[in-house]
Amino acid sequence: MSASLKNQQGFSLPEVMLAMVLMVMIVTALSGFQRTLMNSLASRNQYQQLWRHGWQQTQLRAISPPANWQVNRMQTSQAGCVSISVTLVSPGGREGEMTRLHCPNRQ
């Protein structure tokens, strides 16, 4: 064997252990970030669903609510305008409230 091959060495045990610890810390941090990101996306999706169904329920002719959703719709009329208030509760327990005023076009 040549002298240069005899002098070459691999990584020492402390270097390998340090690299493994760093890798585990990075993977753990990334998995926590991914979990947080997924939870925030799920929350955003629930909020969008709540908004969309609330908007549909405040129409003059509301469509039937999705299964497992609780809807409380109240409609009042005054001075030719119709006010529709809706309280929604999603199957996941998220609650929302919306009020919309419908007035006819006067020309």
Curated annotation (Swiss-Prot):
Cellular compartment(s): Membrane
InterPro entries (alphabetical): N_methyl_site (IPR012902), PpdC-like_C (IPR022204)
Propeptide: 1-10
GO annotations of cellular component type: membrane
Transmembrane parts of this sequence: 11-30
Superkingdom field: Bacteria
Transmembrane keyword on record: yes
Alphabetized Pfam families for the sequence: N_methyl, T2SSppdC
Location, primary (coarse class): membrane
Keywords: Membrane, Methylation, Transmembrane, Transmembrane helix
Reported function: Not yet known.
Entry protein name: Prepilin peptidase-dependent protein C
Organism listed in the record: Escherichia coli (strain K12)
